[in-house]
Regions:
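Sec-dependent signal peptide recognition
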Residues: 1-10
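Flexible, gly/ser-rich surface segments that form the specificity/activation loops bordering the active-site cleft
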Residues: 90-138, 143-149, 164-176
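Terminal peptide-recognition signature
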Residues: 36, 50, 56, 60, ...
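C-terminal motif of bacterial Sec signal peptides marking the signal peptidase cleavage site
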Residues: 15-16
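A conserved glycine-rich beta-strand in the N-terminal activation segment of trypsin-fold
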Residues: 20-24, 29-74
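Active-site loop architecture of trypsin-fold serine endopeptidases
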Residues: 45-47, 62, 68-71, 110-118, ...
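Conserved active-site neighborhood of the chymotrypsin/trypsin-like protease fold
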Residues: 56-115, 209-213
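C-terminal cap/linker of serine protease catalytic domains
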Residues: 19-25, 88-91, 165-218
Length: 218
């Protein structure tokens, strides 16, 4: 299995996109995520997307500054946080991504409307070396735009297989020699279900053990 080592992500924090996304007003897209905004000391300055995980918690990206109600940050330092957020009715079903399957990346745009991009999942894992988490993120080639960070990666069966982080610049970095991403139109990075499930297990253990709050954010 080939690893793409990277020292930065482009598009996750800064403005920009890596392709053309489309507005989507369908119920399935709009119901799969919600908007989150930064709180004090920079209220509403930053925006991201988030996905409901269960009745009480949702997940989004850690790199979005000052997100309120963060209950837990990834134990390895990966780009994931759990936030306190009550489910509004049903919450989505999750599963692991499958190499080669078609997906839809969903999230908000800077214009506060739902946007989507189509792509597929690739086998090559992505390592953000500057993060030092050691976690293997996943790759799809659907386009992303600022605001889609934390938004769902939807499989064709309606399950969510991960959440978007950002994109890797193939303009500045040649990855053509990596057979695991051959044919990819672009490299968009997402946190796969396996990492989210692992971190939920740790958070759940800490919640069940009042003496073990090492990883729970205060």
């Amino acid at each position: 299995m080939i690893k793409i080592m990277a020292y930065f992500l482009i598009g996750a924090v800064t403005a920009g996109c890596n392709g053309i996304v489309k507005p989507d007003f369908s119920g399935s897209a709009n119901d799969s995520y919600f908007l989150v905004y930064s709180g004090f000391p920079a209220p509403y300055l930053y925006m991201a997307s988030a996905v409901q995980w269960n009745d009480d918690y949702a997940v989004t990206t850690r790199h979005t500054p000052f997100i309120p109600n963060v209950k837990y940050s990834c134990s390895t330092g990966c780009d994931l946080v759990f936030i306190l957020h009550k489910a509004n009715g049903r919450y989505p079903s999750w599963r692991a991504p499958r190499v080669g399957e078609s997906i839809t990346a969903v999230g908000a745009s800077p214009y506060f409307m739902t946007t989507t991009g189509k792509g597929k999942v690739y086998e090559t894992p992505f390592v953000n070396a500057a993060e030092h988490s050691g976690d293997l993120y996943a790759i799809h080639d659907a386009p992303l735009i600022k605001g889609m960070s934390g938004g769902p990666v939807l499989a064709s069966d309606g399950h969510i297989v991960g959440i978007n982080i950002g994109f890797y610049s193939t303009t500045l970095n040649d990855v053509s020699n990596h057979s695991g991403v051959k044919g990819a139109e672009r490299l968009s990075i997402f946190i796969p279900y396996s990492i989210i499930q692992r971190e939920w297990g740790i958070l759940q253990a800490k919640l069940d053990d009042p003496h073990g709050a090492k990883y729970v954010a205060k």
